[in-house]
Amino acid sequence: MKWGILATGTIAKKFASTVEQMGAEGEQLVAVGSRHLESAQAFAQQYSIPRCYDSYETLAADPEVEAIYVATPNTLHYENCKLCLEQGKHVLCEKPFTIDPEQAQQLYRLAEEKHLFLMEAFWIWLLPLYDRLREILAAGTIGELKQITCQYGFVASGARKNRKFDSGLGGGALLDIGIYNLGFLRILTGQDPEKVETKEVHINEYGTDDYSRLALTYPGGCKAESVQTIGQELERNARILGTKGSIFLPDFQHAETMTLEVEGKEPEVIRCPVDINGFEYEIREASRCVKLGRTGSDRYTPQDSLALTRLMYDTRMSWGMKFAGEV
C-alpha cells in the first residue's frame, strides 16, 4: 500500500523506518506532510520519500497516496483524521485515537459512510505474544482470572516533557502510556471494567496527570491495578494470577517473552519475537483490511478503540482534568 505520513516527530520516524523495511511486502512511503517545509524535506531525504509537503491539506490531496498515518499530538487527531477521510484516504491514527468518545464515534461513522478503512494504531494489541496469550487464557490453562497488575513509567524531560505535559496537546500519563496498561487489561479480559477507582492521582502545574494508580473490577470478579507515570522510571512488567496458575511478563509493552507457571508443572518461558519492532503488525493489518474492503479491523475493532477512549475520558473527568479548550 502507498503510504503518506502526516507529521514528522519521533513516532512518525519509527513508522517510516518500519515501512522502509517492509518493501518486499509491498508497503511504500510516497509522501510526507509537515507544517514546516524544512521538516518535511529532511524527513523525506532521511527515508527516501519522493514527495514532501508544507501542509497536511496538500498531503491529504495527493492522488498517489492511498493511506495516511496520522502522527500528530493527541488533540489534533480528530481534525487530522477527518481531513484525510474527507479526501478519500484510508487512515491509521496514532494512539490515543481521540481525546473523547464523541470524536471517535464521529470518525468511525465517517469512515463507514465513505467506505474507507480507519484504525487506531494501538500496535501492542496485534503482537504475536498476545495471540499466544489469548490462546492460553481461552484454553483455561491458568483457570479463571483473579488478579492482574501492570505498571509503566518513565521520566519525561526536555522538549519531550513539554509535549507530554502540555494540556493543549492532550498531555499526561493516562493518555500517553496509561492506554497501554488499560489496553493490556482489555486484551486479557475482553470486557469493560464494572468499576474503576482512582487510588492515587497527581495533577501537575501544567494541569495534566503525571501519575495515577487505578483499581479496576471486571465482570466475574477479576481485580486489576494499573500504575502509570511520566515522572518516574518503572519497569513495564505485568503479572496475571488465575485460579490454577500465573503468567509474568517482564515487559508487557514490547512483549516478546512471558513465563507461564501452572500448578504441578515446571515454569515455562514462552518467546514470540517480533519481526521488526512491533509496528509491522498494525501496518500489515491495515493493508489486509484495505484489500478486503473493510472499514475497520476485526482484530482491533472500532468497539475496542471506543471502549478505551471512553474509559480514559471517564477516568480523567472523574479527576476534573479537562484539556485546554475542552468544554
Where are these regions (language model features)?
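Beta-loop-alpha module in the N-terminal Rossmann-like domain of NAD(P)-dependent dehydrogenases
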Residues: 47-110
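Rossmann-fold dehydrogenase core element
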Residues: 105-123, 144-146
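C-terminal helix-rich "cap/oligomerization" subdomain common to oxidoreductases
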Residues: 58, 67-69, 219, 288-327
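Contiguous beta-strand/loop segments that form the cofactor/metal-binding neighborhood of enzyme cores
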Residues: 183-257, 273, 285-294, 326
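Predominantly a Rossmann-like dinucleotide-binding segment in NAD(P)-dependent oxidoreductases
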Residues: 124-196, 204
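N-terminal Rossmann-like dinucleotide-binding module
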Residues: 1-47, 321
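Hydrophobic residues in well-ordered beta-strands that form the structural core
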Residues: 53, 93, 118-120, 249
